[in-house]
Amino acid sequence: MSEDNNNGKEYILDADSELRFEIEQKDAKVFVTLISGFAELFGTELVKKKKYEFGIGAKVAIFTYQGCVLQVTGKMDVCYISKETPMIQYINCHAALEQFRTDAEEHDKRGPVILVVGPMDVGKSTLCRILLNYAVRVGRRPLYADLDVGQGAISIPGNIATILIERPASVEEGFAKTAPLVYHFGHKSPSGNSVLYNAVVSKMAEVTLQSLDANKRTKSSGIIVNTCGWVKGYGYKHLLHAARAYRARAIFVLDQERLYNDLLRDVPSNVHVVLLPKSGGVVERTKELRHESREQRIKEYFYGNMRTPFYPFSFEVKFQDLRLYKIGAPPLPDSCMPIGMKAEDNKKKVVAVTPTSSLLHHILTLSFAESTDENVIGTNVAGFCCVTEVDMERQSVMLLSPQPRPLPPNALLLWSELQFMDNHA
């Protein structure tokens, strides 16, 4: 039910219903205020009388367990109230996880590790956000691991990352991305280098599981793992690999019964596999929208957003000062490989890259590794820069970077297929 007034429109929501809206127009802004009752956005409670702002690309679902009144101003492309919502099932999942965590706390063991899986555009990252928010609201400190290299919920696309969640996500900006643990992959899909993808997932899982033991509260809180939407063929094998690497206690499958049954067959019987419905508010994104979303994530890394703008630096680096590498050499048959090596080992080989004009717009990853003698694949990264100009005459590139010149001593840069067109005025 909705009522118009001079300050916009008031929506009266019954218990266990949600207001859904989308914003697609470029300069549109929508403001939402909780007038009365209790409501939450993906597990984060709304504060009464506080005005929340949403812009282009926002796909919002404000849920209430008890009923509420919301005031909404601004132009939305889609807006409606729905009583068909999976939130009750999601809160039941949280309750089950809390039982695991309480048991882990009492016996000083690791809390539950949960994989959230499903095809593209079924709400995997949203479910992760809900479960993480519910966990911190009851005093937990879970880890959040993001294996979705295509979109990047924690770091920029083309990488996998983990953060510690200590407080609920901001309604408008999501989780604070403080001190993330990030590993370079360099492609927007695991299919770009399946061998490398499994290697970096294994490494991050190893480090993340070890870090659980460093803090008692985090240890019992466990890990929520978001995964890619590639669930067939090699994509399915990547899911099984991730489940093994993270020693998953449970797998939440969104909206695909076939995937649910395949996992029931293929994972150990002590792993709980749970089929969950997706929200009716989940919107299927086109290829173009997914590309725009990647661009926006990279832009926010360099320039921030309306509320927290960043001011990156641009500086010149000579070719001779660039220590640039790529992970993965062209495949060779086993017969051409050195004794003891397999063709798949080439997929993890660190290869020097000669700077050319083809570097233009590519993202470069700054590794904490200082030489190729170190385990570059297993070393996390310090940050990213973007090649905004290549001057073959001057034998130099212009880099866009969050930090001023110069690059750190012994800086080792890794090539990524991800590109960013810096049109920022």
UniProtKB/Swiss-Prot annotation:
GO CC terms on record?
mRNA cleavage factor complex; tRNA-intron endonuclease complex
InterPro entries the record matches: Clp1, Clp1/Grc3, Clp1_C, Clp1_C_sf, Clp1_N, Clp1_N_sf, CLP1_P, P-loop_NTPase
Per its UniProt entry, which superkingdom is the organism in?
Answer: Eukaryota
Q: Which residues bind ATP?
A: E18, K59, D121, V122, G123, K124, S125, T126
For biological process, the GO terms are: mRNA 3'-end processing; tRNA splicing, via endonucleolytic cleavage and ligation
SUPFAM superfamilies, A to Z:
P-loop containing nucleoside triphosphate hydrolases
Major site of localization recorded for this protein: nucleus
Q: What does this protein do?
A: Required for endonucleolytic cleavage during polyadenylation-dependent pre-mRNA 3'-end formation.
Name by which UniProt lists this protein: Protein CLP1 homolog
Query: Which organism was this protein described from?
Result: Drosophila mojavensis (Fruit fly)
